[in-house]
Amino acid sequence: MKIAYILLAHNNPSQLKRLVDSLKNTGDFYIHIDKKSDIRPFKQVFEGMESVHLLEKRVKVSWAGWSMVVGYMLALQAALENEKNYERFVMLTGQDYPLMSNEEIIKTFEDNRDVEYIMAYNIVTSSVPTDKNKILKRWYLDNPFRSRFLQRAYKGIMYRVVTRPFSGKELRVPLNGKLVDPYFGQMLSAFTRKGAELLMDTYLHDKKYNKKMKTVFAAVEIYWQTLFFNSELRQNTVQHGEEHEITEHFGWAPLHYHHYYVDTSVFTEEDFDELKDCGYMFCRKMVVGKSEGLMDKIDEMRREK
């Protein structure tokens, strides 16, 4: 099983190195470092590691902005173009950490070669009132400024002038020449090569879809979700189609254990017992200065498996 890990990261090179080391010998890593960040410390920690590919082409990434999609697509494109012909493409962030052993990770993917690890629900039929605003309002979340003061000012102005007063009427989005229902789910997914090629082909060629996705809220949680659940691959997903109701443990991330409903959502050593038996492949998020003890315990657990 040839695995390519597709990552976005922006800080803490040592933590990213620890994540990569924990998955050593399971696959290769294609990493987009936020253009706002100095890439030199990342190059230093990964010097001599042939399995790690730090992208030369980078963009400035803003939370929930279209730029997050672009960052992932640049990394995915590099992996697809590699002559190794990868069979599985796993999307991660620099704050993730594996819970399964490397042997378990490989076996899971080998035993489920045709499964698209993605989950989502239909925004049109969603019972959550704010879901529809992700599509109906125009969001401009890619911030051109470095200064936090200017970032806050830009965000406030764009919301007051563009987002709040504007509301469209069409919930469906243009995809492959027709209007389809949009879907929402976690960005962290894992695709077969067929799925990854479908995603890349859409990104490179469907201009109307891309134009619409540039103004939705958190495109990275709508872009491939809408694509997959309006394609023939929807029956190959972990739920064999969309989720039909909002569950108590929000997540829609088939491989990641994540307290999505908690603002801080940082795991610490106190969470070890909860994580060790959760059954997920990965967890997020880990933060330097808070999660080292937990990662030490997870490392020990993974060695014993």
PLM region spans:
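ER/Golgi luminal nucleotide-sugar-dependent glycosyltransferases, focusing on the catalytic module
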Residues: 1-305
